[in-house]
Design a protein with these regions (language model features):
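Terminal accessory/targeting
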Residues: 1-96, 116-143, 239-351
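Metal-dependent polysaccharide deacetylase catalytic core of the NodB/CE4 family, i.e.
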Residues: 41-60, 76, 89-99, 108-113, ...
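Conserved beta-strand segments of alpha/beta enzyme cores
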Residues: 79, 155, 216-217
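Short, electropositive alpha-helical surface patch
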Residues: 176-178, 206-219
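Catalytic-core region of carbohydrate-active enzymes that cleave or remodel glycosidic bonds
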Residues: 188-191, 213-223
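A ligand-binding cleft/hinge motif common to bilobed small-molecule-binding domains
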Residues: 224-228
Length: 351
């Protein structure tokens, strides 16, 4: 009888332990459940679109400059992170900074120009595909996308169906768009990609919450460096184009490090008259040194200016002088931490 009770008690303990593990490591939780100062060296995600399409400077990069970017990364002894490893190891603090390469929209210029170079040098990347334009003029077709998928280092990501301004649409339209894209991915690839990129980097709380229940990771288009405490479904990337891909700037970007924080408010990134300007608050970890040196800049009133910040016991608040104007409001904060520049950005969509 005593032995049976001991065995029953032991089984209960094991079941409880398994339950706790499942709760702790649920990869589809909207945000990491446990926040701690990790001293993570970070993952720097960079985003490209077109290659050698000089008619579109806001989304284009020349191949010559792109190759120099890769050389700068390698010369800095930084390694490209395979997307699958990035997902599987997200909750592990990085002892060395890594680079995650992402490409949005599956333009034909990527396949014609960048893909042969990446294939030759076996550089891993994510290609985010919107299903509606596939096969149209200027876009890759499904056979070309499958060629990327068959490689050992190319991963296909989800970028909606229409690539529309979905944040402007009804919740029903957003859901229908994602579900239609899912059907097409299943038909063409046999599965639905688990990495997601919000079209134009825009999302509301509703969109983010839905994506968090159906994908493993999601990216915006706001700058910053990823660490284990960042929300898995609001991950930052540095957008690179002809203007913002200039070599001097790129050298600075790859030398940035994450600025970790416990909490950032507001969670809702879609602003209206009722909540614009937002009540912005960030709580940093007690272990973060030199946070008193932080500076923030914001484009409130459509004018970039130094923010009026208040820092009390590791909690930062910003007093905005004016509301943000459509379409995007941004706040960039950085701190010199004993020679390491730490950076994060928050983006709001203004309606």
């Amino acid at each position: 009888m005593i032995i049976k009770k001991i065995l029953s008690f032991t089984a209960s303990i094991i079941n409880l332990f398994i339950f706790i593990i499942i709760l702790t490591f649920n990869s589809n939780a909207q945000e990491n459940n446990f926040k701690y100062f990790s001293n993570d060296e970070g993952v720097l995600s960079i985003m490209y679109h077109r290659f050698n399409e000089f008619k579109y400077p806001s989304t284009n990069i020349s191949m010559d400059i792109f190759k120099k970017h890769v050389e700068l990364i390698l010369d800095a002894n930084l390694n490209f992170y395979h997307p699958k490893d990035f997902v599987n190891e997200f909750d592990i603090p990085k002892k060395e900074k890594k680079i995650l390469l992402t490409v949005d929209d599956a333009f034909l210029s990527f396949y014609d120009n960048a893909w042969p170079y990446l294939e030759k040098n076996q550089i891993p990347f994510v290609l985010f595909v919107s299903t509606e334009p596939v096969g149209n003029k200027g876009y890759m077709n499904w056979e070309q996308i499958k060629e990327i998928e068959r490689s050992a280092f190319g991963v296909i990501g989800h970028h909606s169906h229409s690539h529309d301004y979905l944040i402007d649409k009804s919740e029903e339209v957003f859901l229908d768009d994602i579900k239609l894209s899912n059907q097409i991915f299943k038909e063409k690839l046999g599965y639905v990609p688990t990495l997601f990129s919000y079209p134009f980097g825009e999302y509301s709380g509703f969109m983010r919450d839905y994506i968090s229940r159906n994908f493993k990771i999601a990216f915006g288009q706001h700058s910053g460096i990823i660490d284990v405490n960042k929300n898995k479904f609001e991950l930052p990337r540095f957008p690179i184009n002809e203007k913002y891909g200039e070599i001097k700037r790129f050298k600075s970007i790859i030398n940035y490090y994450p600025l970790e924080y416990k909490n950032l408010e507001p969670e809702e990134k879609k602003l209206s008259k009722e909540n614009n300007p937002p009540k912005f608050k960030v709580r940093f970890f007690d272990e973060q040194k030199n946070i008193e040196n932080i500076n923030c800049y914001s484009n409130e009133g459509d004018k970039w200016m130094k923010s009026k910040i208040k820092l009390v016991e590791k909690e930062l608040t910003i007093e905005f002088r004016e509301p943000f104007l459509p379409r995007r409001g941004r706040i960039n904060c950085s701190v010199n931490d004993d020679g390491k520049w730490r950076w994060f950005c928050t983006q709001f969509i203004i309606r």
